[in-house]
Swiss-Prot record:
Cellular location(s): Nucleus
Domain of life of the organism encoding this protein: Eukaryota
Cellular component per GO, a single term: nucleus
Feature: DNA-binding region: 147-215
Keywords assigned by UniProt, alphabetized: DNA-binding, Nucleus, Transcription, Transcription regulation
Short name of one Pfam family: HMG_box
GO molecular function per UniProt: DNA binding
Main location: nucleus
Organism: Neurospora crassa (strain ATCC 24698 / 74-OR23-1A / CBS 708.71 / DSM 1257 / FGSC 987)
Stated name of the protein: Mating-type protein A-3
SUPFAM superfamilies in the record: HMG-box (SSF47095)
Length: 324
């Protein structure tokens, strides 16, 4: 397993309090603790590879060698790996004000029993790349007021797999770990996801108990109370009031029924068409041919009925009358 050599620096960058220098392969990064609340231009100190790492009061500032990217890490972050291009920087938590070399508690190094002073000094100058097991005991995501947020189900799942992934491949970057954990979470069994949801709810309850000032008594959103607020205090009606209400309802019902019947009758009168008068059968009159009309097809030379006989003068007179 790769390791980092830590050397103390005491004669570099006068005016700043040096902390330590980290050698990782060909890269050498110098860490300096700044006494200013904000970073100023004089706080930036260039190392051998022109990369800049500066400790602030509450943050760690890192600038890439080509000055194309800047990263700021807030405390506490323990041992964190940050990726820039094709090389990594491992930074340590800020040590105490008095010593110049990081203490064992800060670096997470356990002192073996029976070791001499030289072995202890040599072990204090080595930082293991493996993250400590208690690195994610508290969430590093903070709210605007500085209080850590409760961890959700995915964050708990991420932290549960982190030690296993680092033990299998210590060279994994944060981006690769996030991609791997996301793929495992999407293919995880629903029962396992339900278990992590329960753990997340327990985390919320713990966070509520530790930070009651963040949870006011009156919630902003409606709760999932099985009993609605309108059912918590049942309405009690006396028998006298009940009878009075029933009589009022009967009166209103009768009035509404009468008004409804009148409206229906008026509507039926308007909509229903008037019935037509009945017409009797057409009378069957006998056709009587008038006797003064002569059929032109009748042969006058043939003997006719004496009642219908006409003289020649009558016939001529009739024809002239018809012609005029």
């Amino acid at each position: 397993m790769s390791a980092l050599d830590v050397d103390s620096i005491s004669d570099i960058a006068p005016g700043l309090s040096p902390v330590t220098a980290i050698h990782y392969g060909r890269i050498q990064v110098m860490l300096f603790r700044s006494h200013l609340a904000e970073f100023a231009e004089e706080d930036l100190v260039y190392a051998m590879d022109n990369s800049v790492v500066v400790f602030g009061e509450e943050a760690l500032l890192m600038v890439a060698p080509d000055e194309s990217s800047i990263a700021i890490c807030t405390y506490p972050f323990g041992l964190m790996m940050m990726e820039w291009g094709n090389w990594d920087i491992l930074a340590v938590s800020p040590p105490s004000r008095t010593p110049t070399i990081p203490s064992e508690s800060v670096l997470g190094i356990s002192n073996q029993g029976g070791a001499n002073v030289e072995q202890q000094e040599q072990s204090s100058h080595t930082i293991d790349m493996t993250l400590p097991s208690n690195f994610f005991e508290q969430s590093s995501v903070t709210q605007s007021n500085g209080t850590s947020r409760p961890r959700n189900q995915f964050v708990l799942y991420y932290q549960w797999l982190l030690d296993t992934l680092f033990s299998e491949d210590p060279s994994l970057s944060a981006r690769n770990i996030s991609q791997i954990v996301a793929g495992l979470w999407n293919s995880e069994h629903p029962a396992a996801k339900a278990r992590f949801r329960e753990l997340a709810e327990m985390e919320v309850h713990r966070h509520r108990a530790e930070n009651p000032h963040l949870y006011p008594d009156q919630p902003r959103f409606p709760t999932t109370d099985p009993v609605p607020p309108r059912m918590r205090y049942p309405c009690v009606i006396s028998p006298e009031d009940r009878q009075r209400i029933l009589r009022m309802l009967d009166f209103v019902w009768e009035e509404s029924n009468g008004q409804l019947a009148a409206e229906e009758a008026a509507l039926n009168d308007v909509v229903q068409p008037q019935q037509a008068e009945e017409v009797g059968p057409f009378p069957d009159f006998e056709w009587e041919e008038p006797n003064h009309i002569i059929d032109m097809s009748t042969d006058l030379s043939v003997a006719q009925d004496p009642d219908f006989m006409m003289t020649e003068d009558d016939s001529m007179r009739f024809l002239l009358k018809q012609a005029s």
